[in-house]
């Protein structure tokens, strides 16, 4: 579909992917030309454990880029019949685990693709960043927030981490050019 035509390198799961159940979600994900990453859900149904990966490592212009995904707690957000036995893991602990793992794999850049929302009851992007270290950028969604410019949250080391959110429903499409010194 359209997302394949847009050339995504990776995507994550949002709560609305569950609207028509796990079997439908698996069918949709199988049709994609890019990986779906989500590190804080564990699946046991419809081959989703083989389709959804916690992270992916991309190679671009000589850089090794680790991308992991985070998604919101489903209980109270999605009808339980639509998410079945999906297990939700704490996004803060999971983000730290993923950043550590990707740094050990010598990634030059670690990106979190998040559907947690900006400030969402203690488990949004801001809170995850402020309680972890090792991620370089968060590309967020869920709260339908539109940032005209990047926002920053300090990580555990006091380093400002950029966060971008582009609203909802594809009204805005973000484009970001990163420039940094490879050490």
Q: Residues of each region from the PLM?
A:
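Acidic, metal/ion-coordinating pockets
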Residues: 1-183
């Amino acid at each position: 579909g359209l997302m394949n035509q847009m050339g995504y390198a990776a995507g994550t799961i949002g709560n609305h992917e569950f609207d028509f159940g796990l079997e439908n979600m698996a069918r949709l994900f199988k049709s994609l030309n890019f990986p779906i990453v989500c590190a804080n859900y564990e699946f046991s149904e419809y081959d989703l454990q083989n389709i959804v990966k916690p992270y992916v490592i991309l190679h671009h212009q000589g850089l090794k880029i680790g991308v992991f995904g985070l998604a919101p707690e489903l209980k109270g957000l999605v009808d339980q019949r639509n998410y079945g036995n999906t297990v939700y893991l704490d996004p803060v602990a999971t983000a730290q685990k993923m950043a550590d793992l990707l740094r050990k794999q010598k990634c030059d850049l670690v990106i979190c693709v998040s559907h947690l929302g900006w400030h969402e009851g203690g488990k949004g992007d801001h809170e995850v960043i402020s309680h972890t270290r090792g991620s370089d950028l968060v590309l967020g969604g869920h709260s339908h927030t539109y940032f005209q410019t990047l926002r920053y949250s300090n990580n555990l080391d006091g380093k400002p981490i950029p966060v971008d959110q582009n609203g909802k429903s594809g009204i805005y499409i973000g484009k970001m050019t990163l420039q940094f010194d490879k050490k």
